[in-house]
Curated annotation (Swiss-Prot):
Transmembrane segments: none annotated. Keywords: Ribonucleoprotein, Ribosomal protein. Gene3D superfamilies: Ribosomal protein L13 (3.90.1180.10). Pfam families: Ribosomal_L13. InterPro entries: Ribosomal_uL13, Ribosomal_uL13_bac-type, Ribosomal_uL13_CS, Ribosomal_uL13_sf. GO terms for molecular function: mRNA binding; structural constituent of ribosome. GO terms for cellular component: cytosolic large ribosomal subunit. This is Large ribosomal subunit protein uL13. This protein is one of the early assembly proteins of the 50S ribosomal subunit, although it is not seen to bind rRNA by itself. It is important during the early stages of 50S assembly.
């Protein structure tokens, strides 16, 4: 007799949360958001089922990078052409594409498989304070007490 509850994909209830990234360290924000995207904050967490909630991150341009990460942390990507490796520092990414900086950080904390890619689709990041998910009535989540 099995007494462990295993969630089924059809019976998962999802909520929308909104998180303000102003003056919060990038790694601390990313761990909390990745945990919510996976559903680890729920008692019905099941590792092989997407039980997570939707998360909207606003004010990505005001994220805090501690220490020397603004100049010392380098992100690489390849253009798929010979000799096409490109690099940007975390400070440059925060200035030009702050959404991409947060998305990259959070996606690195999710599982590296099809389930993780599905969970990453529930993340919405905006550089400013405006977002276009008002119809979902997101619940404001204060993560300062969670970090």
């Amino acid at each position: 007799m099995r007494t462990t509850y295993l969630a089924k994909p059809g019976e998962v209830e999802r909520k929308w949360y909104i998180v303000d990234a102003t003056d919060i360290p990038l790694g601390r924000l990313s761990t909390v958001v990745a945990s919510i995207l996976r559903g680890k904050n729920k008692p019905t967490f099941t590792p092989n089922v997407d039980t997570g909630d939707f998360v909207i991150v606003i004010n990505a341009e005001k994220i805090k990078l501690t220490g020397r990460k603004a100049t010392g942390k380098i992100y690489y990507h390849h253009t798929l052409h010979p000799g096409g490796i490109k690099s940007k520092t975390a400070g440059e990414m925060r200035e030009k594409t702050p959404e991409r900086l947060i998305e990259t950080s959070i996606k690195g904390m999710l599982p590296h498989n099809t389930l993780g890619r599905k969970q990453a689709l529930k993340l919405h990041v905006y550089a400013g304070s405006e977002h276009n998910q008002q119809a979902q009535n997101p619940e404001k989540l204060d993560i300062t007490n969670l970090i």
